[in-house]
């Protein structure tokens, strides 16, 4: 099976949708220049319910016209012409978009869901699309469209993942096969966000404190251990050593909180870290011999004895 769409529909024409449109419509892109004598030229169409509602909506329409993209503020029968639909609305509107598009889809059309949603929300979107005869593909965007445009890295999951990724990579995207289980790409992004947005919040708290103390440059230059082993391995090492050193680190965070308050910074994230470490201390899992466990062993101990929720 291979993909050869003639019409692509974009649901949502904000930062993501318009960036994808620019890539598809660029010189040398998927749409390319009209070919002489071609009775069925490749086309990009779009739907954005904010079209012409305000200054932003007016700008969306202007950009669509510049690119030669036929855009509408409503879900209309024009969607039935699309062989490939790319949904790039905000996560809270993903199901609404899927349900609005589903009755209009061409049978067998691929529906690429780029929305930031949970795995369960992805399942709801998928059921709406598949009930209408569409082929649902779960995609997690792992970078920003603002800097990367259509080349923002993506993880792709779904029953037709191989041909979809092959088509995407041949037409300007940067896509990677994750697997055949829809929802898994969305779940990867959600869990990754715990780290990335957490680091963002910590960075705000730490760097504001450092700047107020006049030591920002020095703090930024003392991250050599992270640079040396890479971020993912660094986080893994922290998890392993957390089993052994949670008590010492908990006490240290109490002093860190005091430092921030003395600097006039509310230790919001610091306080959460202190409570998180105290939770491990209270579980009493530190090994008597002080031996650092493997990552698998550490995760099992934390999951079974420290972190509740099920």
What residues fall within each predicted segment?
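Short, basic/aromatic-enriched C-terminal tail that caps enzymatic domains
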Residues: 290-310
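Rossmann-fold NAD(P) dinucleotide-binding segment
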Residues: 75-135
């Amino acid at each position: 099976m291979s993909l050869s769409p003639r019409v692509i529909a974009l649901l949502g024409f904000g930062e993501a949708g318009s960036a994808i449109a620019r890539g598809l419509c660029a010189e040398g892109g998927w749409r390319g220049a009209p070919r002489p004598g071609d009775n069925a030229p490749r086309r990009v169409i779009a739907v954005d319910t904010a079209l012409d509602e305000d200054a932003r909506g007016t700008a969306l329409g202007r950009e669509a016209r510049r690119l030669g993209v036929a855009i509408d503020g409503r879900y209309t029968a024009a969607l039935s012409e699309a062989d490939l639909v790319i949904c790039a609305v905000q996560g809270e509107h993903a199901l609404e978009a899927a349900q609005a598009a589903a009755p209009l889809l061409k049978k067998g059309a691929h529906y690429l869901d780029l929305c930031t949603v949970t795995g369960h929300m992805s399942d709801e979107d998928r059921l709406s699309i598949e009930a209408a005869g569409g082929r649902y593909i779960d995609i997690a965007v792992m970078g920003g469209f603002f800097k990367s445009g259509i080349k923002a890295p993506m993880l792709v999951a779904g029953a037709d993942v191989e041909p979809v990724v092959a088509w995407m990579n041949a037409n300007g995207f940067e896509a990677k096969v994750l697997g055949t289980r829809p929802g898994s790409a969305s779940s990867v992004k959600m869990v990754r966000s715990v780290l990335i947005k957490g680091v963002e919040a910590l960075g705000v708290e730490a760097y504001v404190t450092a700047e107020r103390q006049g030591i920002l440059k020095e703090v930024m230059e003392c991250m050599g251990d992270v640079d040396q082993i890479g971020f993912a391995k660094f986080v893994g090492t922290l998890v392993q050593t957390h089993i052994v050193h949670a008590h010492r680190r908990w006490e240290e965070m109490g002093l860190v909180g005091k430092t921030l308050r003395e600097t006039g910074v509310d230790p919001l994230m610091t306080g959460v870290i202190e409570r998180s470490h105290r939770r491990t201390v209270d579980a009493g899992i530190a090994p008597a011999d002080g031996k650092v466990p493997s990552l698998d062993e550490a995760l099992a101990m934390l999951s079974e004895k420290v972190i509740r929720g099920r």
